[in-house]
Design a protein with these regions (language model features):
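Extracytoplasmic strand-loop-helix segments at the start of, or within, the mature domains
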Residues: 51
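Active-site-adjacent loop/helix segments that line or gate small-molecule/cofactor pockets in enzymes
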Residues: 22-26
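ATP-binding/phosphotransfer module of carbohydrate and carboxylate kinases, centering on a glycine-rich
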Residues: 6-14, 28-44, 55-163
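General beta-strand structural signal in soluble alpha/beta enzymes
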Residues: 16-21
Length: 163
């Protein structure tokens, strides 16, 4: 594999930091959004064509968790529960919420998080599916919506520059 961060650093001759889009969104929601000032383990998911994830423990990112690839009922979770699958399979909000319930219950069992934050484009319609979920962990919609990725990337870059 190629270390893209190192390659860019060498080419540009400047400090470079990198992270994936879900990790960037997670950092933004913890620093400035729905999970601001919430202690403990925060799991931010981005529901889109797949399922992105960010795990932040007491403000520290655990990078590249890729929780959309967990196996649920013999399937890759995002192949059953992503927002893209809801559209592709023409699932009602109720049927899709059942799939989300299996996914979030599994993640909850593995991590015992203090908060779930749900992002991605479909989070704008959170009232259609979040109330249908029955979890021990509070689950809330993202606040930063489509700006979360760029806000999180800028935040990470500023933190890297300061250190």
């Amino acid at each position: 594999g190629v270390n893209l961060t190192e390659l860019m650093r060498e080419h540009l001759g400047r400090p470079v930091t990198g992270l994936n889009d879900a990790d960037a969104a997670g950092l933004a929601e913890v620093a400035f959004g729905a999970a601001k000032d919430v202690p403990g383990t925060i799991i931010v998911t981005t529901l889109g064509t797949g399922i992105g994830s960010a795990v932040i423990v007491d403000g520290t990112l655990v990078p590249n968790t890729e929780l959309g690839h967990l196996e649920i009922d013999g399937y890759d979770a995002e192949s059953r529960a992503s927002a893209g699958q809801r559209t592709a399979q023409d699932l009602s909000w109720k049927k899709w919420a059942k799939r989300l319930q299996r996914y979030y219950s599994h993640v909850e069992m593995l991590f015992s998080p203090d908060l779930f934050v749900v992002g991605g484009g479909v989070s704008r319609k959170h009232e259609k599916y979040l109330p249908l979920l029955d979890l021990k962990t509070p689950i809330v919609p993202a606040q930063l919506l489509n700006t979360a990725g760029i806000v999180g990337a800028a935040y990470q870059a500023s933190r890297a520059r300061a250190s």
